[in-house]
């Protein structure tokens, strides 16, 4: 799974991507210029808590993305953790991710 790293790539997804919000995850999706392998970023803002909490949230998001067979080719996807992500089960996060991907038109 390739990741989005540069600020320019994040900016492009924010400016021209679709977004969907859930209670456990927020998602931003933008179509890439080429049909290469999709890239994913996992974001846990500092307002969620200390490093232990943020890292757990990112691990749960990463595993949910793996279970849902992300990445989908031709897309850049940014997954944001919310305060409820820390206490949620992997199954709940995975279900929410699937619902949000359908909402933005990927699945």
Give each language-model segment a name.
Residues 1-107:
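Positively charged, solvent-exposed patches that mediate nucleic-acid binding
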């Amino acid at each position: 799974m390739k990741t989005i790293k540069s600020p320019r790539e994040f900016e492009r997804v924010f400016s021209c991507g679709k977004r969907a919000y859930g209670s456990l995850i927020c998602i931003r999706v933008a179509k890439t210029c080429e049909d290469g392998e999709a890239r994913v970023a996992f974001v846990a803002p500092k307002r969620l808590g200390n490093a232990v909490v943020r890292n757990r949230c990112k691990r749960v998001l990463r595993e949910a993305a793996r279970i849902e067979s992300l990445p989908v080719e031709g897309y850049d996807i940014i997954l944001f953790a919310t305060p409820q992500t820390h206490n949620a089960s992997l199954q709940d996060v995975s279900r929410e991710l699937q619902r949000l991907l359908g909402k933005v038109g990927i699945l």
